[in-house]
Swiss-Prot record:
One MF term in the entry's GO annotations: tRNA dimethylallyltransferase activity
Protein name: tRNA dimethylallyltransferase
Catalysed reactions, as listed in the record: adenosine(37) in tRNA + dimethylallyl diphosphate = N(6)-dimethylallyladenosine(37) in tRNA + diphosphate
Source species taxonomy: Bacteria, Bacillati, Bacillota, Clostridia, Eubacteriales
Originating species: Clostridium tetani (strain Massachusetts / E88)
Swiss-Prot/TrEMBL site (Interaction with substrate tRNA) positions: 100, 123
Binding site for substrate: 11-16
Length: 314
């Protein structure tokens, strides 16, 4: 299997510079795994790496869609997998770099984003039948086809009951068997994974986050949000849900003060970092790198390369 390198970690931990040095050493090409860097015109708030800062390292999945367009995980997976193959064809190593865990997982887990196991018409029929005959009747339909779900799902949990019936109709398998097979195939991917997660002392990280927000504001984040608003972007759009954008939009709309917006951006960023770390801990393949244990980024790069080579048996 071909190598797939991942460098992740919470927001503001310092992934970018390390990723560039790793890419030079590995002949790597970076595929952004950041759900905000996907959007054009959203540069400062997403901490986007500009062309002149990339040191000749190819970067992909940055500036893909307009801020008023939606972009799904399934779309990310499709584009990223195509980029991975293109990078292999150039005899380089693809490197997923970013902090959006769902984007990373779409590549390193055998997730299906197709509708192959769905039947909307049948689901609609069951929902209508539930209104006519009651939840208990719908639940009773499970008894002969999926005894496990029948015994473990309460009839009030209508959504799960209907899902179990739908899975059986489409796949011919009880939900429990289908879920078991899905779980067994979860790690069945065509890559050898080298997954590194950067972290540091929480208080230090939170200080870095606060300073980063201040720096973004100094660099013109408010003007960036003003320009997006002038383009027609509003709070209903997926892109404008990003931390830093939604709060400043509230400010520009007169809903909160500027100081309140800054406070909420910092608080939201810290909470996001906490959620990211929780997410990364779920993957047993992740190798954790404590930045506090190293003198500088060069030492961190050296440590990651040593671990990478050991895993490859060099």
């Amino acid at each position: 299997m071909k190598d797939l390198f991942i460098l992740s970690g919470p927001t503001a931990v310092g992934k970018t510079e390390i990723s560039l040095n790793l890419a030079k050493a590995l002949r790597g090409e970076v595929i952004s795994s950041d759900s905000m860097q996907i959007y054009k015109h959203m540069d400062i708030g997403s901490a986007k790496i500009f062309e002149e800062e990339r040191q000749g390292i190819p970067h992909h999945l940055i500036d893909v869609v307009e801020p008023w367009e939606n972009f799904s995980v399934a779309e990310y997976k499709n584009i990223a997998e195509n980029k991975i193959e293109e990078i292999y064809n150039r005899d380089n190593i693809p490197m997923l770099v970013g902090g959006t865990g769902l984007y990373i997982n779409s590549i390193i887990y055998n997730y299906s984003f197709t509708d192959a196991n769905k039947d909307n018409d049948y689901r609609d029929y069951l929902e209508k039948l539930a209104k006519e005959k009651g939840k208990e009747y719908i639940h009773s339909l499970l008894k002969d086809i999926d005894e496990y779900s029948y015994n473990n799902l309460h009839y009030n949990n209508l959504k799960r009951v209907i899902r179990a019936l739908e899975v059986y109709k489409v796949t011919g398998k009880p939900m429990s068997q289908y879920a078991k097979e899905e779980k067994e195939n979860l790690f069945n991917i065509p890559y050898s994974i080298y997954y590194f997660v950067l972290y540091m002392d929480r208080d230090k990280l939170y200080d870095k986050i606060n300073m980063r927000v201040d720096r973004m504001l100094q660099e013109g984040l408010l003007d960036e949000v003003k320009e997006l608003k002038e383009m027609g972007c509003n709070e209903t759009m997926q892109s404008m849900q990003g931390i830093g954008y939604k709060e400043l939009l509230y400010y520009l709309n007169g809903e909160i003060s500027f100081n309140e917006a800054v406070y909420l951006i910092k608080k939201g960023s810290r909470n996001y970092a906490k959620r990211q770390l929780t997410w990364f801990r779920r993957d047993p393949r992740a190798i954790w790198i404590n930045k506090d244990e190293f003198e500088n980024d060069d030492a961190i790069v050296k440590e990651i390369l040593n671990k990478f080579n050991k895993l490859k048996g060099f």
